[in-house]
Design a protein with these regions (language model features):
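A late C-terminal transmembrane helix in Major Facilitator Superfamily
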Residues: 168-198
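Intracellular juxtamembrane helix-capping segments at the cytosolic ends
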Residues: 152-168
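Conserved extracellular-gate-facing transmembrane-helix segments in secondary transporters
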Residues: 54-62
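Symmetry-related core transmembrane helices of the 12-TM Major Facilitator Superfamily/SLC fold
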Residues: 1-7, 211-231
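Intracellular loop-helix junctions on the cytosolic face of multi-pass helical membrane proteins
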Residues: 1-50, 63, 72, 100-105, ...
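C-terminal transmembrane helical hairpin of 12-TM major facilitator-type secondary transporters
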Residues: 109-154
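Short amphipathic helix-loop junctions that connect adjacent transmembrane helices
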Residues: 61-79
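Transmembrane alpha-helices of Major Facilitator/SLC transporters
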Residues: 79-105
Length: 268
C-alpha cells in the first residue's frame, strides 16, 4: 500500500501557471527565513508552542502511564478494548478533518480548528475537575480523554499550519513548525519525568493526571482563544492593506495617475 501511494504521488500532474498564481510556492526555509517568520508571527506562535508543549506532555503521560492511571484489572479492559477505543477516535477525527478539507477558505478553517481544539481542552478540564461527580466508566473516560488530546495534537500536526501558510501567503513549508512543536513537546515530557523521579517518585497517578489535565486544559484554552483573536485581527489588517493596494493600482490604470497623485486622490 505504501509503495502504491508513493507511485501515485509521482503521477500527479505538474502545477499550471494558474495554480502557481493562486498558491504560494513551498520552499525550504533557511535560518534567516525561519527567523523572519517567527518574528512576523511571534505572538501567535508563542501561544501555540506554549499550548502544544503541555498537550504533548499530557498525552505522553497518558500513553506511557495509562496502566498506573486506571485500574486495568478492576475495569476488565483487555488490550483489544484499548485498540478499539483508539480506532474509533481515529475514525472520528478523520471524519472531522475530512469535512474541513472541503472548506476552501483558509481563514475559516483556522478559526474552526482553534474553536475545535478549545472545546477539546475545555472538555479535558471539565472531566478532570468533575471526575468524582461524573462517575464515568473507564471506557467512556478513556474515549473522551483520547478524543480530546488527539484532536488537539493532530490538528497542529496536520491541517493547521498548512492552512496557516496558505492563508497568510508565507513562502515556506510546515516542516519548521512541526519540528519545533515536537522538539518543545518532547523536551517538556523529559523534563516532567526527570522532576517526578528526582523529587516525588511515588505519586497517585490518577490524582496527578487529573490535576494536570484540569489546569493544562484551562491554560491551553486561553492560549488558543488568544491565538484566534490575534489571527483574526492580523487577517483583517492584511486584507485591508491588500484592498488598499488594489484600489491604488486600479486608480493608476484607469486615470493614468502617478503613484503620488493616486495616493492624494485616495486620501481625498
Amino acid at each position: 500500500m505504501l509503495s502504491l501511494l508513493g507511485w501515485l504521488m509521482t503521477r500527479l500532474p505538474q502545477p499550471t501557471e494558474e495554480d502557481k498564481k493562486l498558491r504560494i510556492e513551498r520552499v525550504t526555509l533557511n535560518r534567516e527565513g525561519r527567523m523572519h517568520i517567527f518574528k512576523s508571527f511571534m505572538p501567535v506562535l508563542l501561544l501555540l508552542f506554549f499550548a502544544n508543549l503541555f498537550i504533548t506532555v499530557l498525552q505522553d503521560i497518558k500513553e506511557d502511564f495509562l496502566v498506573k492511571i486506571i485500574n486495568v484489572e478492576a475495569s476488565g479492559l483487555s488490550s483489544w478494548a484499548f485498540a478499539k477505543i483508539d480506532a474509533i477516535v481515529t475514525l472520528v477525527i478523520l471524519f472531522v478533518f475530512g469535512i474541513m478539507s472541503l472548506i476552501k477558505n483558509d481563514m475559516k478553517v483556522l478559526c474552526a480548528l482553534l474553536v475545535l481544539v478549545t472545546c477539546g481542552t475545555l472538555t479535558l478540564s471539565f472531566i478532570a475537575f468533575n471526575y468524582n461527580t461524573l462517575e464515568l466508566s473507564t471506557t467512556t473516560w478513556l474515549f473522551l480523554q483520547s478524543l480530546s488530546l488527539y484532536t488537539v495534537y493532530l490538528s497542529f500536526q496536520t491541517l493547521f499550519f498548512e492552512r496557516f501558510i496558505a492563508c497568510f501567503r508565507i513562502r515556506g513549508n510546515v516542516g519548521f513548525f512541526i519540528i519545533t512543536l515536537d522538539f518543545i513537546g518532547y523536551m517538556g515530557t523529559v523534563l516532567v519525568l526527570v522532576l517526578k523521579e528526582c523529587f516525588k517518585p511515588n505519586i497517585d497517578w490518577l490524582h496527578f493526571y487529573n490535576l494536570m489535565s484540569g489546569y493544562v486544559g484551562v491554560a491551553c484554552a486561553m492560549a488558543f482563544m488568544g491565538a484566534l483573536i490575534y489571527l483574526l485581527a492580523r487577517y483583517r489588517r492584511e486584507r485591508t492593506v491588500c484592498v488598499g493596494k488594489n484600489r491604488l493600482f486600479i486608480t493608476q490604470n484607469c486615470f493614468g495617475l502617478s503613484p503620488k497623485i493616486a495616493n492624494t486622490q485616495q486620501v481625498k
